[in-house]
Amino acid sequence: MALTLAATALVLLPLVTAQQIGSIAENHPELTTYRCSSQAGCVAQSTSVVLDINAHWIHQNGAQTSCTTSSGLDPSLCPDKVTCSQNCVVEGITDYSSFGVQNSGDAMTLRQYQVQNGQIKTLRPRVYLLAEDGINYSKLQLLNQEFTFDVDASKLPCGMNGALYLSEMDASGGRSALNPAGATYGTGYCDAQCFNPGPWINGEANTAGAGACCQEMDLWEANSRSTIFSPHPCTTAGLYACTGAECYSICDGYGCTYNPYELGAKDYYGYGLTIDTAKPITVVTQFMTADNTATGTLAEIRRLYVQDGKVIGNTAVAMTEAFCSSSRTFEELGGLQRMGEALGRGMVPVFSIWDDPGLWMHWLDSDGAGPCGNTEGDPAFIQANYPNTAVTFSKVRWGDIGSTYSS
């Protein structure tokens, strides 16, 4: 049974803030995940997911007027953070399938498009993994651990990205007197791109137009033709609201990227290749420390795959400081050590599907990064030719090295 949360998650907050939560209940779809150990094997967890706050309806308290406009916050309702919090309420989402999220047991399918009222609507859902309490995010501490999942990328054409990554978001989603909704309603997103997240930052009105920076570990950015993984360290811990030029110097937005195609393995990943994207793939990422303990310094990030019962190694042995030495600002901003510090503090799993209207995803699958043509990533082309675009993630698990997969 899915988790239905309206006021339940907020009982510990002062009553004065209850007016900021609307009357429509939030109905989190359950997504079973697994915590694994060498001794006990994998144990199921009753976790769930929540859509980002920007997918929720936030409106004037006692009225139907939205607190946002096409250009951002409505200045008459949100001239500042405090007034905005007093004027606006957030409503829950009861039907996640209408936002492109369909869960069943330990599997979740994210859909890019949906026909609504006879028209194809672009959805681009992004969801975060909640802990078993349904109130806070699952923050995974992965030093000297591995993170594994199964993925079906067969319905992701050129120009699409079905992503699973880690973000150093606050476990509560920044829950506070001005943001009583918190993680329960998907607040607090941040990443190493430091982009302006829109009207809300850490659940509060983003009246300054700040960017939301934090460390990011891209476990999987991929479609059926190309794949990358990349750590993105930052000089700060947790979410940092940046403004102006500092938004370009706090985090390594480019990251240390591993792309097998770009490194010359052109027959490694794709339909019918060594990693056959026509079939589901098990993806394993291992975070190895220098002393093989959960408190050690991150020394390597290893990647391997399992398909048809066979363990398939990565085309490079591991991602190390030596491998990343030429990656723009990666070393300057702390490299693997800084990334490891975030993994030690804990990071939140993020799942998404999206297209790229600005760059057409060339950085992932074209212009030397993959085999796709220069125009195949045009969102209009994708919508016209691949209306069933989707990605399915399943059997998400994490734990001791070697405990999450078998051959």
From Swiss-Prot:
Keywords, A to Z, come to:
Carbohydrate metabolism, Cellulose degradation, Glycoprotein, Glycosidase, Hydrolase, Polysaccharide degradation, Secreted, Signal
Reaction(s) catalyzed by this protein? Endohydrolysis of (1->4)-beta-D-glucosidic linkages in cellulose, lichenin and cereal beta-D-glucans
Cell compartments where the protein resides: Secreted
The EC number on file is: 3.2.1.4
Which coarse location class applies to the principal site listed for this UniProt protein?
secreted
Q: Which GO terms describe its cellular component?
A: extracellular region
Signal peptide interval: 1-18
Alphabetized InterPro entries for the sequence: ConA-like_dom_sf (IPR013320), Glyco_hydro_7 (IPR001722), Glyco_hydro_7_sf (IPR037019)
Active site, UniProt feature: 216, 221
A Pfam family of the record is Glyco_hydro_7
Report residues carrying sugar chains: 136
Q: Does the keyword DNA-binding apply?
A: no
User: What CDD domains does the record tag this protein with?
Assistant: GH7_CBH_EG
Q: Which GO terms describe its molecular function?
A: cellulase activity
Which example biological process does GO assign this protein? cellulose catabolic process
Using the UniProt record, name the top-level EC class of this enzyme in a single word.
hydrolase
> Its function?
Has endoglucanase activity on substrates containing beta-1,4 glycosidic bonds, like in carboxymethylcellulose (CMC), hydroxyethylcellulose (HEC) and beta-glucan. Involved in the degradation of complex natural cellulosic substrates.
Query: What protein family does this chain belong to?
Result: Belongs to the glycosyl hydrolase 7 (cellulase C) family.
Name of the protein in its database record: Probable endo-beta-1,4-glucanase celB
Species this protein is from: Neosartorya fischeri (strain ATCC 1020 / DSM 3700 / CBS 544.65 / FGSC A1164 / JCM 1740 / NRRL 181 / WB 181) (Aspergillus fischerianus)
Traced from the root, the source organism's taxonomic lineage reads: Eukaryota, Fungi, Dikarya, Ascomycota, Pezizomycotina
